[in-house]
Amino acid sequence: MTKELEATLAEASSPAWTRRVRAGRDLASSADVPEAAEALVGLLLDADDTAVTRQTAEALTREGTEASVRLIARAVAEADDNRADWLQTGVHDALMGPGGAPGVLAACGKLARDPEGAVRQGAAHIAAWAADPR
Protein backbone atom coordinates (compact mmCIF):
# COMPACT_ATOMS: atom_id res chain seq x y z
CA MET A 1 0.00 0.00 0.00
CA THR A 2 1.35 3.42 -0.92
CA LYS A 3 1.84 6.21 1.60
CA GLU A 4 -0.67 8.29 -0.34
CA LEU A 5 -3.32 5.57 -0.02
CA GLU A 6 -2.54 5.18 3.69
CA ALA A 7 -2.97 8.93 4.21
CA THR A 8 -6.25 8.96 2.31
CA LEU A 9 -7.54 5.99 4.31
CA ALA A 10 -6.71 7.91 7.50
CA GLU A 11 -8.74 10.88 6.21
CA ALA A 12 -11.72 8.58 5.68
CA SER A 13 -12.11 8.34 9.46
CA SER A 14 -11.44 12.02 10.18
CA PRO A 15 -13.87 13.84 12.47
CA ALA A 16 -14.01 16.62 9.85
CA TRP A 17 -16.69 15.97 7.23
CA THR A 18 -14.74 17.93 4.61
CA ARG A 19 -11.81 15.54 4.97
CA ARG A 20 -14.12 12.54 4.70
CA VAL A 21 -15.62 14.00 1.51
CA ARG A 22 -12.14 14.47 0.06
CA ALA A 23 -11.23 10.91 1.06
CA GLY A 24 -14.32 9.56 -0.71
CA ARG A 25 -13.39 11.39 -3.90
CA ASP A 26 -9.75 10.35 -3.70
CA LEU A 27 -10.48 6.70 -2.90
CA ALA A 28 -13.09 6.22 -5.64
CA SER A 29 -10.46 5.24 -8.19
CA SER A 30 -9.22 2.54 -5.78
CA ALA A 31 -12.59 0.83 -5.30
CA ASP A 32 -11.01 -2.51 -6.22
CA VAL A 33 -8.47 -2.29 -3.36
CA PRO A 34 -9.93 -4.11 -0.32
CA GLU A 35 -8.86 -1.50 2.26
CA ALA A 36 -10.22 1.32 0.12
CA ALA A 37 -13.45 -0.58 -0.56
CA GLU A 38 -14.08 -1.02 3.15
CA ALA A 39 -13.47 2.67 3.81
CA LEU A 40 -15.67 3.69 0.87
CA VAL A 41 -18.66 1.67 2.10
CA GLY A 42 -18.23 3.37 5.47
CA LEU A 43 -18.23 6.76 3.75
CA LEU A 44 -21.31 5.88 1.70
CA LEU A 45 -23.12 5.04 4.93
CA ASP A 46 -21.59 7.95 6.92
CA ALA A 47 -23.83 8.45 9.94
CA ASP A 48 -22.68 11.99 10.65
CA ASP A 49 -23.02 13.90 7.39
CA THR A 50 -25.07 13.32 4.26
CA ALA A 51 -22.61 15.37 2.17
CA VAL A 52 -20.10 12.55 2.66
CA THR A 53 -22.66 10.01 1.44
CA ARG A 54 -23.71 12.10 -1.54
CA GLN A 55 -20.27 13.08 -2.77
CA THR A 56 -18.76 9.63 -2.29
CA ALA A 57 -21.65 8.11 -4.28
CA GLU A 58 -21.10 10.71 -7.00
CA ALA A 59 -17.37 9.99 -7.19
CA LEU A 60 -17.90 6.23 -7.36
CA THR A 61 -20.61 6.62 -10.01
CA ARG A 62 -18.29 8.77 -12.12
CA GLU A 63 -15.74 5.94 -11.97
CA GLY A 64 -18.43 3.66 -13.41
CA THR A 65 -16.47 0.46 -12.84
CA GLU A 66 -17.98 -2.78 -11.66
CA ALA A 67 -16.00 -2.44 -8.41
CA SER A 68 -17.21 1.10 -7.75
CA VAL A 69 -20.85 0.37 -8.57
CA ARG A 70 -20.69 -2.78 -6.41
CA LEU A 71 -19.84 -0.61 -3.39
CA ILE A 72 -22.76 1.71 -4.03
CA ALA A 73 -25.03 -1.33 -4.48
CA ARG A 74 -23.90 -2.77 -1.14
CA ALA A 75 -24.55 0.56 0.54
CA VAL A 76 -28.00 0.90 -1.07
CA ALA A 77 -28.95 -2.53 0.25
CA GLU A 78 -27.85 -1.58 3.79
CA ALA A 79 -29.11 2.01 3.85
CA ASP A 80 -32.20 3.32 5.58
CA ASP A 81 -34.61 5.36 3.44
CA ASN A 82 -32.95 8.70 4.21
CA ARG A 83 -29.46 7.45 3.41
CA ALA A 84 -30.74 5.73 0.25
CA ASP A 85 -32.18 9.07 -0.90
CA TRP A 86 -28.75 10.68 -0.53
CA LEU A 87 -27.08 7.79 -2.34
CA GLN A 88 -29.58 8.24 -5.17
CA THR A 89 -28.87 11.98 -5.26
CA GLY A 90 -25.13 11.33 -5.57
CA VAL A 91 -25.69 8.82 -8.37
CA HIS A 92 -28.02 11.29 -10.10
CA ASP A 93 -25.46 14.12 -9.78
CA ALA A 94 -22.87 11.99 -11.59
CA LEU A 95 -25.30 10.83 -14.28
CA MET A 96 -26.42 14.39 -15.02
CA GLY A 97 -22.96 15.93 -14.77
CA PRO A 98 -20.51 16.58 -17.58
CA GLY A 99 -19.77 13.33 -19.37
CA GLY A 100 -22.37 11.44 -17.37
CA ALA A 101 -21.37 8.02 -16.13
CA PRO A 102 -21.53 5.72 -19.16
CA GLY A 103 -20.26 2.60 -17.41
CA VAL A 104 -22.94 2.45 -14.74
CA LEU A 105 -25.64 0.54 -16.63
CA ALA A 106 -23.14 -2.02 -17.93
CA ALA A 107 -21.80 -2.51 -14.40
CA CYS A 108 -25.35 -2.93 -13.07
CA GLY A 109 -25.98 -5.54 -15.75
CA LYS A 110 -22.98 -7.55 -14.59
CA LEU A 111 -23.92 -7.11 -10.93
CA ALA A 112 -27.44 -8.39 -11.63
CA ARG A 113 -25.81 -11.85 -11.71
CA ASP A 114 -23.70 -11.34 -8.59
CA PRO A 115 -23.77 -14.22 -6.09
CA GLU A 116 -24.46 -11.76 -3.24
CA GLY A 117 -28.18 -10.97 -3.00
CA ALA A 118 -27.64 -7.54 -1.46
CA VAL A 119 -25.44 -6.53 -4.39
CA ARG A 120 -28.05 -7.72 -6.91
CA GLN A 121 -30.76 -5.80 -5.06
CA GLY A 122 -28.71 -2.61 -4.82
CA ALA A 123 -27.64 -2.84 -8.47
CA ALA A 124 -31.29 -3.12 -9.51
CA HIS A 125 -32.03 0.13 -7.68
CA ILE A 126 -29.06 1.88 -9.29
CA ALA A 127 -30.06 0.62 -12.75
CA ALA A 128 -33.57 2.01 -12.22
CA TRP A 129 -32.12 5.37 -11.14
CA ALA A 130 -29.85 5.43 -14.20
CA ALA A 131 -32.68 4.50 -16.57
CA ASP A 132 -34.95 7.24 -15.17
CA PRO A 133 -32.70 9.95 -13.73
CA ARG A 134 -35.67 12.08 -12.57
Please report, for each region that a protein language model flagged, where it lies by residue.
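Long, hydrophobic N-terminal alpha-helical segment
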Residues: 4-28
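Short inter-helical turns and helix N-cap capping residues of alpha-solenoid HEAT/ARM repeat scaffolds
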Residues: 15-16, 48-49, 79-84, 115-117
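Short, charged, intrinsically disordered terminal tails
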Residues: 121-134
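Structural signature of alpha-helical solenoid repeat scaffolds
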Residues: 28, 61, 92-96, 128
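Hydrophobic alpha-helical segments that drive targeting, anchoring, or assembly
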Residues: 21-22, 44-61
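Amphipathic alpha-helical scaffolding segments comprising HEAT/armadillo-like alpha-solenoid repeats
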Residues: 1-11, 31-45, 65-77, 99-112, ...
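Residue-level detector of extended alpha-helical repeat arrays and alpha-solenoid scaffolds
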Residues: 19-20, 53, 84-88, 120
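Mid-chain, well-packed structural core segment of small domains
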Residues: 71-90
